Amino acid sequence: HIEVGMGKGRFLMDLARLHPDINYIGIEMYDSVLLRALQKREELEENGEVYSNLFFMRVDARLLPEIFEKGEVDKIYLNFSDPWPKARHAKRRLTSREFLARYDQILVQDGKVEFKTDNKELFEFSLEEVEEAGWNLEASTFDLHHNEEMVQGNVMTEYEEKFSSMDHPICKLIAKRRCLL
């Protein structure tokens, strides 16, 4: 499982702790952000926590198909990604058709993308892109924390906690890779 744009890494650290049988890779393109995640992990490990199933990589997400083999990744998490609000930057959005095509190259046959955001416009864009790319939308909600089914097992990110505490609804979608016969 990978998280693209992992930020400080807490989400993946929580998942790695909950599921020691699954390997997690955090992808981050900014050195300063990656350094903060490494420091946080080191601090937790000094207190006795073990993260043998957690790895971090400094890489641009556009290069994912060059790093991972076809069918190597089970799940991709996109949490509170930069919305790139200007129309001319739409291809930079991590839920654009261009990025979905990259994910399609590395996911297993029934691989999934899970996306969370507080940005309704980005979420609506993402729903359209999933459909246009021919992916199967397994589930979606404009208010995760009031959707009993989708909130089950939810691991919150730092941004999610912050925005939820301010009563901002959190949007979430789960898209399944398009089936190629």
Label every PLM stretch briefly.
Residues 95-109:
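A short glycine-rich, Lys/Arg-flanked "PGG" loop and its adjoining helix->strand segment in the class I
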Residues 9-13:
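Glycine-rich SAM-binding Motif I of class I
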Residues 110-117:
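Conserved beta-strand signature within the Rossmann-like core of class I S-adenosyl-L-methionine
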Residues 126-128, 132-181:
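Class I S-adenosyl-L-methionine
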Residues 35-40, 125:
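Short alpha-helix adjacent to the SAM-binding motif of class I
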Residues 30:
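Conserved SAM/SAH-binding beta-strand->alpha-helix loop
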Residues 39-71:
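S-adenosyl-L-methionine
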Residues 4-7:
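Class I SAM-dependent methyltransferase "Motif I" SAM/SAH-binding loop
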